[in-house]
Amino acid sequence: MVSPLRLRGPRARHRDPTARPRTARLSQLKTGDPADPATDFGPLSSEKAAQTFVEQIDDAVSKGATLRTGGKRVEGPGAFVEATVLTDVTPQMRAFSEEIFGPGVVIYRVADADEAIELANSSAFGLGGVVYSKDPQRAQDVADRLDTGMVWINSPQGWAADLPFGGTKRSGAGRELGPLGIDEFVNKKLVYTPAG
């Protein structure tokens, strides 16, 4: 599963995220035991991962980003961090240039699809992306221009075991799962015999 961590939307449609019900709802999500059905977010993979995530948030806020919700460790044992929303993130911030492995999202305001694509492709990472559009052809055109290993259109949740999984750039090379994943386990050999 790939979770979208960076949302890029047109400035003309952007509303104050603090007024949106989804952002407000994030502050009410429960962290805890991932085996408990009432839990929304389990712990991060390690104490170091939780520390890195909080450092990315603190770095962004110290350099002018707006923390809309979350951003703090959850009290008690375990590598838990609150669900977090950041806006006004710039290229000088770690949250802009580093992969985020935590329950957080960075919201960018862009002029149009071209700027969103340029911003997305400027990342050193390229595991996956999601395109939302009412126009299927426009969504496909944007997906074709994204430098990522996977793109979902109008849903970040679609998945099946026979679909190839993998990224581009620093998010990896090659694919796992599906027929393309089998190629990762096959040694191919070229044998050349000159004519004559």
Regions found by a protein language model. Name each.
Residues K30-T31, R73, F80-G196:
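Conserved C-terminal structural/oligomerization subdomain of aldehyde/semialdehyde dehydrogenase
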Residues M1-V2:
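Extended low-complexity, polyampholyte segments enriched in Ser/Thr/Pro and acidic residues
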Residues R8-A124:
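NAD(P)-dependent aldehyde/semialdehyde dehydrogenase
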